[in-house]
């Protein structure tokens, strides 16, 4: 699988991509252990909040009448001449063109706009831990495992954030609320939507053991740590603390 990822990276001309020896791995990440590794020096992350704020600034610079409306629920769409009217709980907005980036509500918004969909959004939550200050020296870059191609997840990994914090995770567990970021969050409509969809049960039954293990890890710091130790064996229970969910 590592070799396949390497070939794909080369085909896509990923800058600086190379296969490295275990000695090179030890130089780059002294606390990381593995049987093989790829080094991608051009990889990085961004602060999504800052990036979004800059996009708003640019949009308003290009079109002075541009506005951002927060905290509004889209109730419906309507056609008005050649344009579309977005109806919210606080007003109506008309546009010549409408682009819907609905996130976890994308399927519901599409249906409101008359799109016939068989698919449904099924929510999954990812929990993270963070490294405590005394352990941050154990991770110097971004460290990822070789992903399992059977699942649309990257696997538990280490991310050095723009603010200097280091996130570890996530897991992947079914959530009973689409925007439920707490372990016990629940929404009846979201739950019935998900459990009333045959695709949800197909996913459950074909990945039962994986799902059970993910849930166990969601409620056990020690089990989460064991997964992290596959990449950084020297981590201890005192090195990590609960972080955000997403």
Regions found by a protein language model. Name each.
Residues 1-28, 34, 155-156, 165, ...:
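Dinucleotide-binding Rossmann-like beta1-alpha1 core, especially the glycine-rich loop
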Residues 2-5, 22, 52, 106, ...:
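A general structural signal for well-ordered alpha-helical segments in protein cores
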Residues 18-27, 120-124, 134, 202-246:
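Flavin (FAD/FMN) cofactor-binding core of flavoprotein oxidoreductases
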Residues 18-21, 68-70, 100, 168, ...:
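General beta-strand structural signal in soluble alpha/beta enzymes
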Residues 38-97, 108:
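Helical element adjacent to the flavin cofactor pocket in flavoenzyme catalytic cores
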Residues 77-187:
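Flavin-dependent oxidoreductases
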Residues 177-211:
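Extended, charge-rich helix/loop segments that form flexible
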